[in-house]
């Protein structure tokens, strides 16, 4: 995963010069290093003792404080990054453990359901075998009844000796 805005490289202000304070357009000539003959560089007045020396010390103090703040920010970012890395690792371990437990539980449930299904399939197979057996017995009974019925029908069509004699005597 990418880190966004974490642990940026420290910014060094020691080698950088503070931006010049520009009060008017006249001072811009000194920024371009275009000095006209007879003109005095405005930076020369900053080197004079007096109120400008306190400005130089204030600027140095501000630079130091800014550098300290940047270092503190970078340290905080590094600590945050370490904290997030530890949190991520801990979370991964917990998720992994929970996943393993869930998987084990799923397999236990699958095993239990498989046993139940196997028992029911065995019962079903036994009942189907019994139904097939009863069906065969019923077919045999039907065939026997049919045979008996046919025999009875054939016997009723064939006159017995007495019936034949009776019929012969009528004529």
UniProtKB/Swiss-Prot annotation:
Primary site of residence: nucleus
Record's subcellular location: Nucleus; Chromosome
Highest rank taxon of the organism: Eukaryota
Tissue expression as described in the entry: Meiotic cells (at protein level). Expressed in the ovary and testis.
GO biological process: cell division; synaptonemal complex assembly
Chain intervals with Basic and acidic residues compositional bias: 24-36
Region (Disordered): 1-52
GO annotations of cellular component type: central element; chromosome; nucleoplasm; nucleus; synaptonemal complex
Entry coiled-coil feature ranges: 52-83, 118-146
Disulfide bonds: none
Keyword annotations from UniProtKB, A to Z: Cell cycle, Cell division, Chromosome, Coiled coil, Meiosis, Nucleus
Keyword DNA damage listed: no
Family according to the record: Belongs to the SYCE family.
Function (record text): Major component of the transverse central element of synaptonemal complexes (SCS), formed between homologous chromosomes during meiotic prophase. Requires SYCP1 in order to be incorporated into the central element. May have a role in the synaptonemal complex assembly, stabilization and recombination.
Subunit architecture: Homodimer. Found in a complex with SYCP1 and SYCE1. Interacts with SYCP1 and SYCE1. Interacts with SYCE3. Interacts with TEX12.
Name assigned to this protein: Synaptonemal complex central element protein 2
């Amino acid at each position: 995963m990418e880190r966004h805005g974490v642990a940026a490289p420290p910014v060094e202000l020691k080698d950088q010069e503070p931006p010049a304070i520009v009060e008017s357009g006249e001072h811009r000539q000194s920024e371009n290093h275009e000095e006209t003959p007879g003109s005095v560089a405005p930076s020369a007045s900053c080197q004079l003792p007096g109120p400008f020396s306190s400005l130089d010390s204030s600027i140095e103090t501000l630079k130091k404080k800014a550098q300290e703040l940047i270092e503190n920010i970078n340290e905080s970012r590094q600590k945050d990054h370490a904290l997030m890395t530890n949190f991520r690792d801990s979370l991964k371990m917990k998720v992994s453990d929970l996943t393993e437990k869930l998987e084990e539980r799923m397999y236990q449930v699958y095993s239990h359901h498989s046993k139940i299904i196997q028992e029911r399939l065995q019962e079903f197979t036994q009942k189907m075998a019994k139904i097939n057996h009863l069906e065969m017995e019923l077919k045999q009974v039907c065939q026997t009844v049919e045979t008996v019925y046919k025999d009875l029908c054939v016997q009723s069509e064939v006159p017995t000796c007495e019936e034949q004699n009776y019929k012969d005597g009528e004529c």
